[in-house]
Amino acid sequence: KIAEQKAGIIKPHTSVVSAKQEPEAEAVIKNACLERDCSLQFVDPAQITDVQYGIARQSFSYKGWKQMEISLAGSYQIINAALALEGVMALRALGWRLTDEQVRSGLLATKWRGRFTVIGEHPTVIMDGAHNPAAAQTLKDSLERYFPDRKLHFIFGMFKDKDYHEVIRLTAPLAEDIVTVETPDNPRALPAQELAEAVYPVNPHVRAAKTVEEAVGEVLDEAKEGCEHIY
């Protein structure tokens, strides 16, 4: 269903690029391109090489592009950057003049707030907007890759119309402890206490905060007590 919705933006007689998808979603995109007479190119994960992961900067090579650097953290951002390069190659094929230096500087300068974004240090504070199982799996993968031996403190809020039980199943076991919050002034927000009760069977080290400010203060104090705490 999501693939069908996203394929709806495809315009006839255009060039389409996409990250690698699950077979069912890939078939939807292929059919949409066939119906609208579009060329289609998927990212080839096998051609992503020389990957160097890092919080401040990451690098990789893809096809003819060597040692490309990005400032975005998160293992999935390498895939996103490779997709951007596929877009560049498609534009060049259409006659757009994009120099290698423009592409390199553009990738390095790109920011994406709310996607595994470091917003504080000592302790490291990471903000991520994962709100569905797929995004939660990606967050889990990134936390395990970048902080395999670090203690994690979570401040956690969800909307009640999302599959928060699956998000909890994927991410809650990673946390040393979890403070749940309710998004203020939003009718879709899941109450902090209700969210804490949902978390408890997966990770009993959970408590509900009255406000986001209270949660941030508590968790920062806890994280500063040790030198290896991330939240």
Label every model-predicted segment:
Residues K1-G64, L85-R104:
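Acidic, Mg2+-coordinating active-site environments of NTP-dependent enzymes
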Residues A19-P23, L34-G54, S71-S75, Q102-A109, ...:
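Beta-strand->loop->alpha-helix junctions that form or flank phosphate-binding loops
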Residues P23, Q47-M89, E213-I230:
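C-terminal lobe/tail of nucleotide-utilizing enzymes
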Residues A7-V16, Y146-L152, L174-D177, E222-C227:
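Short, surface-exposed connector motifs at secondary-structure boundaries
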Residues E22-Q41, A56, T124-M127, P133, ...:
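C-terminal helical cap/extension that packs against the catalytic core
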Residues Q5-G8, A90, S142-Y146, L170, ...:
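A generic secondary-structure signal
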Residues I2, I9-I10, V16-V17, V125, ...:
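Hydrophobic aliphatic residue packing
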Residues K1, G64-D177:
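Nucleotide phosphate-binding/pyrophosphate-handling subdomain across enzymes
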